[in-house]
Amino acid sequence: MNVRAAATYLSDRYYDPLMTASRAPAEPTVREFEATVERVDDREVVLDETYFYPESGGQPADRGTLDGHLVDGVVERDDEVVHALASDGDVDLEPGDEITGLIDDAFRTYCARAHTASHVLYGAARRTADDLGYAGFDISETKVRVDLTTAEPLGDGDLIELERLANRAVWDSLPVSWATHSADEAREIDGIAFNTKTEEGAMSGGDAVRVVTVGAEGDPWDVAACGGTHVENTAEIGPIAVLERSNPGEGVTRVEFAVGPTAIDELGGVHAAALDAATTLDARVGDLPDAVARLRDEADRLEADLRDAREELLGARLRELPTTEIDGARWAVGTVDDAEPNELRDPATEAVGSDDDLDALAAVGTGNAPFVVVAVTDAADGDAAAAEIDAGEVVGAVTDEFGGGGGGGPTFAQGGGLDADPEAVAAWLRER
């Protein structure tokens, strides 16, 4: 077998060697069956045999009815499959009754397709990721997740390749088969590896292991120990759409994907979005990356021009602030509208540095959160008056008087959260 070496896709049912009392995994196409009631405990029913799949290993329980009674849940307990009936209505079943079980065809079909799709996706990951391992699996109403451990995080390109390879495996109509082996026999299958946790106890001795093979026996797409229900050919899966990825833990990449209507809607939505974007950018869909790159470059240039223009505007506002003499130094003090403190650092420093008659500047920002910035001419330039001013000390005095907090150095400091009218703060600075 040419399955790329990787940790086998294993069910979460580590307590059981992937065998179940249900006949569903062995005969997944059965939707109606006859059985005898063995035991009834309140609303829980045990049959002599069942084709209902019990919730296990990330695959949800089958839905359906037992002689018209809605089955609300199915679990395996003490090597028995227990059917929990819905709470509405009386349970008129008794031990010895011959009953008919009906399995919800749509939901079983969805789960089988989704479960096989997860094996197909894992097979694709075998061909794209190094040091691949399996960390979890779950089927929900609209999507499936597979948790992979990889040497490096999976990127966008990896997801695209996973989706491409998985859909190619679907198109290639690969057979899907399953067989039961002893644990020792299973270990000898090329390309299959057992999780250490699985090997401890449950996988020892002559325990039976159910092995699912996707593809031809001599050259399979994937080989996995699994107890779920599956389709008999990958063509039955239909389109596979990768939805997103996340990182739930160190070294783990969670890949979420969809099959069926959700996948069709996702792929159609992506195509529609691409067409809309292409129309907006006057480009072909295949040329979108280049068109977006050009647009991004243009946006970056415009943003830089806007920053420069705004800095010039703020500088002009600061140079228009009224000046006053405070302790022998020439100050520009006033309020500034529509500005953020970080935006004023360079314009304020430039304003005091370019005016030989100005020693310091204090600008009070208006708005819901008043702030103050103070810039002082560098004393190294020979300004004796500026040498007596410490911007950080001035901001500290402002926050002591009006609340808030801040800090900085001798030539520039800022403070925010002032609990006062900006004009009152500016007046206090002029008079201090």
Model-based region annotation:
Residues N2-R432:
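A glycine- and charged-residue-rich anion-binding loop/surface
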